[in-house]
Amino acid sequence: MNDFITETWLRANHTLSEGSEIHLPADARLTPSARELLESRRLRIKFLDPQGRLFVDDDEQQPQPVHGLTSSDTHPQACCELCRQPVVKKPDTLTHLTADKMVAKSDPRLGFRAALDSAIALTVWLQIELAEPWQPWLFDIRSRLGNIMRADAIDEPLAAQSIVGLNEDELHRLSHQPLRYLDHDHLVPEASHGRDAALLNLLRTKVRETETLAAQVFITRSFEVLRPDILQALNRLSSTVYVMMILSVAKHPLTVAQIQQRLGEKP
């Protein structure tokens, strides 16, 4: 792609949910209004070349190759967490927890990360399996899961991020009062709900499983919560998929715009 990417093209091809990440062709050029839109939404932009390499712009707008997850362009020396010594040759029993720390593969934190990886894989599969109306939701869920993985891997706070324009508080309200906001009451999954609801329920349960594993890792025996941001994000993602399930079985499912209008109405 040698043409300029415009604001109109971005709106037509991406959800642009605040705090998410988008990939653009490596040779893409942005119009001033397109770049302003991306910056205003706090979007992380990466450029993808035909060989699958990811790049980011530096301050001089020169592309720099980076790691797909961490966005880092450096390769620090990794040390064993137990003995604090550099790992020259990595044994099969160790793996990276962070870029500079290796742990045994039995570490519970890796169990959480494996579940998170599975949730991402399932989301991608549903992006292929489900129809167009669900694509914006799934794109943002995939982005949110990736940002959770990144925040855990580089030990940074997890920024706020909306799903199809709905913030965490709104998603929480929808999942707790579906009859009021979505015209359908709470549901217990069953075959009569159909294929979409069944597939979405697989994702919901995988996200819940990931949340419980995160709780085992990030809540200490003295009930100190080490990563409340990650725990809340996973909880709200579970709520999000539950909302999608309810919309999938509703006789007349509401659009996001209609949902937002109802959320703004006074009781």
Swiss-Prot record:
Disruption phenotype: A quadruple eutP-eutQ-eutT-eutD deletion is not impaired for aerobic growth on ethanolamine (EA) supplemented with cobalamin (vitamin B12). Can grow on EA as sole carbon source when AdoB12 is supplied; double cobA-eutT mutants do not grow with CN-B12 as a nitrogen source. A non-polar deletion mutant grows on EA from pH 5.5 to pH 8.0, but does not grow at pH 8.5, no change in acetaldehyde release on EA plus vitamin B12. Coiled coil: none annotated. Changing residue 67 to A: Reduces metal content of enzyme, does not complement deletion. No binding of Co(2+). Induction: Part of the 17-gene eut operon transcribed from a single promoter, induced by ethanolamine and adenosylcobalamin (AdoCbl, vitamin B12). It is found in: Bacterial microcompartment. Optimum pH is 7.0. Keywords: ATP-binding, Bacterial microcompartment, Iron, Metal-binding, Nucleotide-binding, Transferase. A divalent metal cation binds at residues 80, 83. Binds 1 divalent metal cation ion per homodimer with both subunits providing Cys ligands; Fe(2+) gives most activity and is possibly the physiological cofactor, followed by Zn(2+) and Co(2+). Activity stimulated by Mn(2+). Pathway: Amine and polyamine degradation; ethanolamine degradation. It catalyses: 2 cob(II)alamin + reduced [electron-transfer flavoprotein] + 2 ATP + 2 H2O = 2 adenosylcob(III)alamin + oxidized [electron-transfer flavoprotein] + 2 phosphate + 2 diphosphate + 3 H(+); 2 cob(II)inamide + reduced [electron-transfer flavoprotein] + 2 ATP + 2 H2O = 2 adenosylcob(III)inamide + oxidized [electron-transfer flavoprotein] + 2 phosphate + 2 diphosphate + 3 H(+). Its cofactor is a divalent metal cation. Pfam families: Cob_adeno_trans. Changing residue 79 to A: Does not complement deletion, 20% activity in vitro. Reduces metal content of enzyme, complements a deletion. Changing residue 75 to A: No effect in vivo or in vitro. No binding of Co(2+). One of its GO terms (biological process) is ethanolamine catabolic process. Changing residue 83 to A: Does not complement deletion, 1.2% activity in vitro. No metal cofactor. Its EC number is 2.5.1.154. Disulfide bonds: none annotated. It comes from the Bacteria. One of its GO terms (molecular function) is ATP binding. Converts cyanocobalamin (CN-B12) to adenosylcobalamin (AdoCbl), the inducer of the eut operon. Is not active on cobinamide nor other intermediates in the adenosylcobalamin synthetic pathway. Allows full induction of the eut operon. Can use ADP, CTP and dATP in place of ATP, and cobinamide in place of cobalamin, none are as efficiently used as ATP and cobalamin. Homodimer. Belongs to the Cob(I)alamin adenosyltransferase family. EutT subfamily. This is Corrinoid adenosyltransferase EutT. It comes from Salmonella typhimurium (strain LT2 / SGSC1412 / ATCC 700720).
